[in-house]
């Protein structure tokens, strides 16, 4: 199959960090490994992208960048859209801000086929944007598990938990800086964050792949998420996760190595510290269980179980 993936007008793979660009690149590598041909379109000029698309003559086009949604009606091939916006949840739509008019209202107008990263995202498109359920397909993110080293020894930082994310308002890291064993890695975009407290700097990707496994568990207590890649990366490195209720997409929250902090307890630092400690103790002692769980999120599995069957349904059903 020939697939064109439309991404943001940025380098793919990314030079540094860039979750969407990394996801697109990992999808390409995994699809090609499975025998498919993949074209990445990330030119800032839509006319140039249409020219390249026409020359490639894809069987399917996948728009993976919100601001290119207006291209959808003009694409003469079977097509679907995926958005990575953090607040696409019926109960969080009041946080959309300018995104609503710029992007979400375009979904309401165009009503495209959607490959949603979670069921809650698809529910939002159905009930708020008015998109028919037969145009909504679940399509979770995947992870390149083979990129991650997994230690078979006692982790170097056995008693540390790691908050690995861009340090910003949505991720809320500054709230938890009184938790003594919680460390932070990521570029800083929030002046409320105190760099003198357990800050590890910004990690390069290769450093992440080699060193994530040396921590006890991962923390992600943001106030909005789509399907956070960092949780899948944690599992691939053998770590359990402590997450907010907005970061639970596609996860089995009954697992003992997945701890969900209710939003009404997000300011209860003593409670959160206790939950992080409990999760860390369990996770360090049950790494094989976590690694087994992580296999369902490997890209080749996600593509085989969701992505390619979804494409076939769109093509065969002539859904547009």
Model regions: which residues?
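Short hydrophobic beta-strand element within catalytic cores of glycosyltransferases
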Residues: 240-244, 250
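A short, active-site helix/loop in glycosyltransferases that binds the activated sugar's phosphate group
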Residues: 105-135, 145
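Aromatic "clamp/platform" in nucleotide-sugar-dependent glycosyltransferases that forms part
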Residues: 223
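A charged, aromatic-enriched C-terminal amphipathic alpha-helix characteristic of glycosyltransferases
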Residues: 19, 270-319
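Active-site proximal beta-strand in glycosyltransferases
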Residues: 3-4, 60-63, 72-93, 115, ...
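Membrane-proximal helix-turn-helix segments that form the acceptor-binding/catalytic region
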Residues: 87, 94-115
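Acidic anion/phosphate-binding donor-loop and adjacent secondary structure
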Residues: 91-92, 126-127, 135-159
């Amino acid at each position: 199959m020939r697939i064109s993936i439309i991404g943001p007008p940025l380098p793919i793979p990314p030079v540094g960090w860039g979750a969407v660009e990394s996801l697109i690149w990992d999808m390409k590598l995994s699809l090609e490994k499975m025998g498919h041909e993949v074209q990445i379109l990330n030119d800032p000029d839509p006319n140039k992208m249409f020219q390249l698309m026409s020359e490639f003559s894809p069987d399917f086009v996948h728009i993976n960048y919100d601001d290119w949604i207006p291209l959808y009606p003009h694409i003469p091939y079977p097509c679907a859209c995926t958005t990575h916006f953090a607040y696409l949840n019926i109960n969080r739509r009041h946080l959309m801000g300018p995104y609503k008019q710029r992007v979400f209202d375009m979904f309401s107008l165009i009503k495209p086929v959607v490959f949603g990263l979670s069921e809650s995202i698809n529910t939002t498109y159905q009930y708020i944007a008015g998109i028919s359920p037969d145009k909504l397909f679940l399509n979770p993110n995947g992870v390149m598990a083979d990129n991650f080293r997994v230690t078979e020894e006692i982790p170097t930082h056995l008693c540390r938990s790691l908050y690995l994310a861009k340090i910003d308002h949505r991720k809320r890291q500054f709230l938890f800086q009184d938790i003594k064993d919680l460390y932070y890695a990521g570029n800083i975009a929030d002046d409320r964050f105190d760099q003198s407290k357990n800050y590890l700097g910004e990690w390069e990707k290769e450093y992440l792949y080699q060193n994530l496994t040396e921590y006890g568990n991962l923390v992600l207590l943001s106030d909005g998420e789509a399907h956070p890649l960092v949780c899948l990366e944690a599992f691939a490195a053998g770590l359990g996760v402590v997450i907010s209720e907005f970061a639970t997409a596609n996860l089995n929250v009954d697992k003992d190595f997945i701890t969900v902090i209710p939003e009404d307890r997000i300011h209860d630092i003593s409670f959160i510290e206790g939950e992080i400690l409990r999760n860390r103790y369990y996770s360090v002692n049950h790494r094989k269980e976590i690694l087994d769980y992580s296999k369902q999120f490997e890209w080749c599995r996600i593509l085989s179980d969701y992505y390619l069957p979804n494409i076939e349904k769109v093509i065969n059903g002539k859904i547009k």
